[in-house]
Amino acid sequence: MKQAINNLKDYAELAQASYFYFDLLKDSNGIARKIYELDSKGNKIEDTSYPRGYKEVAISLEHIVSKEYRGQEALINLKQDDTWKSNLLNTLDEKTNFNQLNGEFNPLQVQNFAKRYKICFHQPNTKSGFSATLFSEKRKQKDTESKEIKYTNKYGYINYILAIISTESKEVV
């Protein structure tokens, strides 16, 4: 009975996580997207070595699921060549980018979730409102040196969980 209750809690957490925007991890070319790195007061850190003039970090699973980053803009990957066309496209992309992280997990949930699960596949919302995420659960193993029990994917995964959701359609199908 206790195991069944724990399984229900785990599945409820995965169901909640399936609504997060995992498609913001990478762009359509498979390149990691970024967010601005913030200081302890929540301000962007200036750094002229970055194209936008502020320090940027790659978006991780922890960023996606954490409520600490909720509402933070997921930056568009800029075109690197310095042609007028690329500069124009970069400017337009920046002005029309409304992608924001939408995580809701508290710090302990974030830590446990990131240790335990991996995102195998994510289908972002389609025009019909369909979305799906395939999670894999890592195995619990005892480390031979430290004797610590931790999650690992070294020997494969113990479960695959498919979360299918439906959101409001933006168009009539």
Label for each model-derived stretch:
Residues 1-173:
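Non-catalytic, mobile gating and regulatory segments of ester bond hydrolases
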